[in-house]
Amino acid sequence: MRQILIVLLLAYSATSLADEAALFKQANFPVQWNDGSQVMPRKSQIVLTYLWADIYAAALFTQPDITPQQAFNEQRDLRLELFYLRDLDHSDITDACTTILKRQHSVAFLASQQAALKKLQSSFGDIKRGDRYALDYDPKRGLNIERNGTVIYNSQNHELAKLYLGIWLAPEGLPEKLRQDLLAQRQ
């Protein structure tokens, strides 16, 4: 019985890795991001799975000479792309974000960002399978939110940018292993 369990676990692990590769292929993240003024290589990519359901694939791009962690900590140029693998209701997304942000920040800080956060979250609606969102941060321009290649939101509020990117890149956001994988500089 024990041997059967081990074989099944190994088979599941191999299938999971193969499935992840197929999901990355489907997401088709570029090896580098070029916005016309700079080229940022893809540093990492992950797949978020919740209760055996694949939710999205994500890729992180930063300048070549810094780590993803430095880019986030120092608020340098970075781009986080999300390719959605299933439909999601807007209310489910905002509820999940609110839960994470409450874990990460004080009530007072969240209250100071509430109006800006509400405006950001109202910029997008329900997500459909195949939608591609990007959180693109440039210290000079601020944070752009893109949906399928079109900018749908911009804010020059640097605290809001760090707050929202922190859902994926700060502790207490993503499951820790996924967060570390996203910050790990692996393609």
Where are these regions (language model features)?
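Cysteine/selenocysteine-centered motifs that mediate thiol-based redox chemistry or coordinate metal-sulfur cofactors
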Residues: 177-187
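Short strand-turn-strand beta-turns centered on an Asx-Gly dipeptide
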Residues: 147-149
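Flexible glycine-rich active-site/ligand-binding loops centered on an Asp-His dyad
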Residues: 152-178
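Mid-length scaffold segments of soluble, non-membrane domains
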Residues: 65-140
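N-terminal structural module
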Residues: 19-73
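N-terminal signal peptide c-region/cleavage motif recognized by signal peptidases
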Residues: 11-15
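Positively charged n-region of N-terminal signal peptides that target proteins for export
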Residues: 1-4
